[in-house]
Amino acid sequence: MNNLPRYQFQNRAAGGNCIGMLLTGGKSKRFGSDKLVHTIEGQTVAELSAHALSLACDTCFEVGLGLTGLPVIHDSSGQGPLAAIAQSVMYLRDQKILEFGQCALVLAGDVPLITASTLRIVANWPGRSSLVPVVNGREQYLAARWSPESLDRSIFLTKNGLMKVSKALDVSGTQRLSMDAWESQDNQEFLDIDTPDELRKLVNAELICIPDRRSQS
Protein backbone atom coordinates (compact mmCIF):
# COMPACT_ATOMS: atom_id res chain seq x y z
CA MET A 1 0.00 0.00 0.00
CA ASN A 2 2.99 2.33 0.27
CA ASN A 3 2.84 3.23 -3.43
CA LEU A 4 -0.74 4.45 -3.30
CA PRO A 5 -1.32 8.10 -4.19
CA ARG A 6 -1.69 10.43 -1.22
CA TYR A 7 -3.65 13.62 -0.99
CA GLN A 8 -3.58 16.68 1.23
CA PHE A 9 -7.02 17.01 2.78
CA GLN A 10 -8.70 20.34 2.26
CA ASN A 11 -12.13 21.72 1.54
CA ARG A 12 -13.08 21.59 -2.11
CA ALA A 13 -16.01 22.62 -4.26
CA ALA A 14 -19.04 20.34 -4.66
CA GLY A 15 -18.37 17.00 -6.28
CA GLY A 16 -17.90 17.70 -9.93
CA ASN A 17 -20.22 15.82 -12.22
CA CYS A 18 -20.79 12.82 -9.94
CA ILE A 19 -24.27 11.61 -9.09
CA GLY A 20 -24.50 10.73 -5.39
CA MET A 21 -25.97 7.33 -4.46
CA LEU A 22 -26.69 6.55 -0.80
CA LEU A 23 -27.39 2.87 -0.10
CA THR A 24 -29.92 2.20 2.67
CA GLY A 25 -31.27 -1.24 1.77
CA GLY A 26 -29.15 -3.41 4.07
CA LYS A 27 -30.76 -5.86 6.50
CA SER A 28 -28.55 -5.05 9.54
CA LYS A 29 -28.31 -8.71 10.56
CA ARG A 30 -25.39 -8.20 12.96
CA PHE A 31 -26.97 -5.11 14.51
CA GLY A 32 -30.24 -6.89 15.36
CA SER A 33 -32.46 -4.01 14.19
CA ASP A 34 -32.33 -1.35 11.50
CA LYS A 35 -29.12 0.47 12.40
CA LEU A 36 -29.80 3.26 9.92
CA VAL A 37 -32.71 4.67 11.96
CA HIS A 38 -30.84 4.88 15.27
CA THR A 39 -30.38 8.50 16.28
CA ILE A 40 -27.24 10.38 17.23
CA GLU A 41 -27.81 13.88 18.59
CA GLY A 42 -31.25 13.99 17.00
CA GLN A 43 -30.30 12.71 13.55
CA THR A 44 -30.38 9.14 12.31
CA VAL A 45 -27.31 7.31 11.10
CA ALA A 46 -28.69 7.40 7.56
CA GLU A 47 -29.46 11.13 7.75
CA LEU A 48 -25.91 11.94 8.84
CA SER A 49 -24.50 9.98 5.90
CA ALA A 50 -27.00 11.59 3.52
CA HIS A 51 -26.15 15.08 4.75
CA ALA A 52 -22.46 14.65 3.97
CA LEU A 53 -23.22 13.19 0.54
CA SER A 54 -25.67 15.97 -0.34
CA LEU A 55 -23.01 18.57 0.43
CA ALA A 56 -20.52 16.75 -1.79
CA CYS A 57 -22.72 16.17 -4.86
CA ASP A 58 -25.23 18.50 -6.48
CA THR A 59 -27.58 15.61 -7.36
CA CYS A 60 -28.15 12.75 -4.91
CA PHE A 61 -30.49 9.79 -4.58
CA GLU A 62 -31.19 7.37 -1.79
CA VAL A 63 -31.26 3.78 -2.98
CA GLY A 64 -33.37 1.80 -0.55
CA LEU A 65 -36.06 2.50 2.00
CA GLY A 66 -36.66 6.26 1.96
CA LEU A 67 -35.08 7.14 5.31
CA THR A 68 -33.33 10.43 4.59
CA GLY A 69 -35.45 12.90 2.63
CA LEU A 70 -33.36 12.44 -0.52
CA PRO A 71 -35.20 11.38 -3.70
CA VAL A 72 -35.68 7.63 -3.43
CA ILE A 73 -34.98 4.80 -5.83
CA HIS A 74 -36.61 1.81 -4.17
CA ASP A 75 -34.38 -1.25 -4.08
CA SER A 76 -36.73 -3.94 -5.31
CA SER A 77 -34.04 -6.56 -5.85
CA GLY A 78 -33.20 -7.31 -2.21
CA GLN A 79 -29.97 -8.91 -3.41
CA GLY A 80 -27.40 -6.64 -1.80
CA PRO A 81 -25.52 -3.46 -2.63
CA LEU A 82 -24.24 -4.36 -6.09
CA ALA A 83 -27.72 -5.22 -7.34
CA ALA A 84 -29.06 -1.99 -5.82
CA ILE A 85 -26.37 0.02 -7.60
CA ALA A 86 -27.07 -1.71 -10.91
CA GLN A 87 -30.81 -1.11 -10.60
CA SER A 88 -30.20 2.56 -9.84
CA VAL A 89 -27.84 3.00 -12.77
CA MET A 90 -30.38 1.56 -15.19
CA TYR A 91 -33.16 3.73 -13.76
CA LEU A 92 -31.16 6.96 -13.73
CA ARG A 93 -29.89 6.40 -17.25
CA ASP A 94 -33.38 5.60 -18.48
CA GLN A 95 -34.61 8.85 -16.92
CA LYS A 96 -31.75 10.79 -18.58
CA ILE A 97 -30.46 11.83 -15.13
CA LEU A 98 -27.22 9.86 -15.28
CA GLU A 99 -25.29 10.15 -18.52
CA PHE A 100 -23.52 7.10 -19.91
CA GLY A 101 -20.13 8.78 -19.45
CA GLN A 102 -20.86 10.02 -15.92
CA CYS A 103 -19.43 8.79 -12.62
CA ALA A 104 -21.31 8.09 -9.38
CA LEU A 105 -20.19 8.67 -5.81
CA VAL A 106 -21.47 5.60 -3.98
CA LEU A 107 -21.83 5.72 -0.19
CA ALA A 108 -23.18 3.21 2.30
CA GLY A 109 -25.78 4.62 4.67
CA ASP A 110 -24.02 3.48 7.84
CA VAL A 111 -20.97 5.77 7.91
CA PRO A 112 -22.18 8.70 10.05
CA LEU A 113 -18.67 10.07 10.62
CA ILE A 114 -17.96 10.69 6.94
CA THR A 115 -17.60 14.36 6.00
CA ALA A 116 -18.47 16.28 2.87
CA SER A 117 -14.90 17.51 2.49
CA THR A 118 -13.60 13.95 2.27
CA LEU A 119 -16.31 12.93 -0.18
CA ARG A 120 -15.50 15.96 -2.32
CA ILE A 121 -11.89 14.83 -2.54
CA VAL A 122 -13.00 11.42 -3.80
CA ALA A 123 -15.54 12.88 -6.23
CA ASN A 124 -13.18 15.55 -7.59
CA TRP A 125 -10.07 13.41 -7.95
CA PRO A 126 -8.63 14.07 -11.45
CA GLY A 127 -9.96 11.91 -14.25
CA ARG A 128 -13.06 9.74 -14.55
CA SER A 129 -11.68 6.42 -13.36
CA SER A 130 -13.00 4.61 -10.33
CA LEU A 131 -11.33 5.82 -7.14
CA VAL A 132 -11.33 3.59 -4.05
CA PRO A 133 -10.16 5.04 -0.71
CA VAL A 134 -7.91 2.72 1.28
CA VAL A 135 -8.01 3.07 5.06
CA ASN A 136 -5.67 1.01 7.24
CA GLY A 137 -5.28 -1.46 4.37
CA ARG A 138 -9.03 -1.82 3.77
CA GLU A 139 -10.56 -0.80 0.46
CA GLN A 140 -13.71 1.28 0.91
CA TYR A 141 -15.81 0.19 -2.06
CA LEU A 142 -18.95 1.83 -0.70
CA ALA A 143 -17.37 5.22 -0.12
CA ALA A 144 -15.88 5.42 -3.58
CA ARG A 145 -16.19 7.05 -6.97
CA TRP A 146 -17.47 4.56 -9.53
CA SER A 147 -16.48 5.15 -13.14
CA PRO A 148 -18.90 4.63 -16.04
CA GLU A 149 -17.09 1.34 -16.71
CA SER A 150 -17.64 0.16 -13.13
CA LEU A 151 -21.30 1.18 -13.29
CA ASP A 152 -21.66 -0.78 -16.55
CA ARG A 153 -19.96 -3.74 -14.93
CA SER A 154 -22.38 -3.66 -11.99
CA ILE A 155 -25.19 -4.31 -14.46
CA PHE A 156 -23.29 -7.07 -16.26
CA LEU A 157 -22.36 -8.84 -13.03
CA THR A 158 -25.81 -8.77 -11.48
CA LYS A 159 -27.44 -10.00 -14.67
CA ASN A 160 -25.10 -12.98 -14.41
CA GLY A 161 -25.83 -13.59 -10.73
CA LEU A 162 -22.49 -12.27 -9.48
CA MET A 163 -22.96 -9.99 -6.47
CA LYS A 164 -19.45 -9.25 -5.17
CA VAL A 165 -19.06 -5.47 -5.04
CA SER A 166 -15.29 -5.48 -5.52
CA LYS A 167 -15.63 -7.20 -8.91
CA ALA A 168 -17.38 -4.15 -10.35
CA LEU A 169 -14.35 -2.04 -9.52
CA ASP A 170 -11.99 -4.56 -11.09
CA VAL A 171 -11.70 -2.57 -14.32
CA SER A 172 -8.84 -0.91 -16.15
CA GLY A 173 -7.74 2.38 -14.62
CA THR A 174 -9.24 1.93 -11.14
CA GLN A 175 -7.15 3.87 -8.63
CA ARG A 176 -6.61 3.28 -4.91
CA LEU A 177 -6.20 6.36 -2.75
CA SER A 178 -4.31 6.03 0.53
CA MET A 179 -6.15 8.13 3.10
CA ASP A 180 -3.08 8.76 5.24
CA ALA A 181 -4.94 11.18 7.51
CA TRP A 182 -6.74 8.13 8.95
CA GLU A 183 -3.60 6.45 10.31
CA SER A 184 -4.42 7.95 13.72
CA GLN A 185 -6.61 5.77 15.93
CA ASP A 186 -8.52 8.89 16.95
CA ASN A 187 -9.95 9.48 13.47
CA GLN A 188 -12.49 6.90 12.38
CA GLU A 189 -14.25 8.75 9.59
CA PHE A 190 -14.80 5.65 7.45
CA LEU A 191 -16.10 3.57 10.36
CA ASP A 192 -19.28 1.72 9.49
CA ILE A 193 -21.60 0.65 12.27
CA ASP A 194 -22.29 -3.09 12.35
CA THR A 195 -23.21 -3.70 16.01
CA PRO A 196 -24.93 -1.79 18.85
CA ASP A 197 -21.62 -1.87 20.75
CA GLU A 198 -19.86 -0.06 17.89
CA LEU A 199 -22.57 2.60 17.92
CA ARG A 200 -22.29 3.06 21.71
CA LYS A 201 -18.52 3.42 21.51
CA LEU A 202 -18.85 6.00 18.76
CA VAL A 203 -21.39 8.06 20.69
CA ASN A 204 -19.52 7.79 24.00
CA ALA A 205 -16.29 8.90 22.35
CA GLU A 206 -18.12 11.97 21.00
CA LEU A 207 -16.59 11.41 17.58
CA ILE A 208 -19.52 12.94 15.71
CA CYS A 209 -19.65 16.70 15.52
CA ILE A 210 -22.83 17.69 13.71
CA PRO A 211 -22.19 21.48 13.79
CA ASP A 212 -18.91 20.91 11.92
CA ARG A 213 -20.84 19.07 9.24
CA ARG A 214 -23.20 21.96 8.77
CA SER A 215 -20.32 24.40 8.51
CA GLN A 216 -19.12 22.59 5.40
CA SER A 217 -22.10 23.69 3.33
Which stretches of residues belong to each language-model region?
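Nucleotide and nucleotide-moiety/phosphate-recognizing core
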Residues: 3-165, 170-188, 197-210
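Dinucleotide-binding Rossmann-like beta1-alpha1 core, especially the glycine-rich loop
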Residues: 191
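Long, low-complexity, intrinsically disordered segments
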Residues: 210-217
